[in-house]
Amino acid sequence: MQKIRKGDKVVVLTGKDKGRTGEVIQVMPKEDRAVVRGVNVVKRHQRQTQNQEAGIITKEAPIHLSNIAIADPKDGKPTRVGFKIDGDKKVRVAKRSGDVIDG
């Protein structure tokens, strides 16, 4: 089970977007990276294709998982993630507050 999943609210810990929060759009476990909405935005030059015109587009670039942390459900501050067996299900738990992260 992954500690950071698609749809999680995360806080950026280091880099040019330090302190920003966003939602995880995509997780790439093999590369240990994630794409977060509104974070690590880069400009790319786009060549013209049949269905897209040329120009400079902005998009989110992947950020390393070590540079982001899940936002605590209680106060929104960064927290580490632990696991707990709840009945017969394994759930993610915020180490900071003890709240269950999984909906």
UniProtKB/Swiss-Prot annotation:
SUPFAM superfamilies: Translation proteins SH3-like domain
Any GO BP: translation
An example Gene Ontology CC term for this record: ribonucleoprotein complex
SMART domains: KOW
The keyword Ion transport belongs to this UniProt entry's keyword annotation: no
Keyword entries, A-Z: Ribonucleoprotein, Ribosomal protein, RNA-binding, rRNA-binding
UniProt family annotation: Belongs to the universal ribosomal protein uL24 family.
Function as written in the Swiss-Prot or TrEMBL entry: One of two assembly initiator proteins, it binds directly to the 5'-end of the 23S rRNA, where it nucleates assembly of the 50S subunit. One of the proteins that surrounds the polypeptide exit tunnel on the outside of the subunit.
PANTHER family documented for this protein: MITOCHONDRIAL RIBOSOMAL PROTEIN L24 (PTHR12903)
NCBIfam families recorded: rplX_bact
Quaternary organization: Part of the 50S ribosomal subunit.
Official protein name in the record: Large ribosomal subunit protein uL24
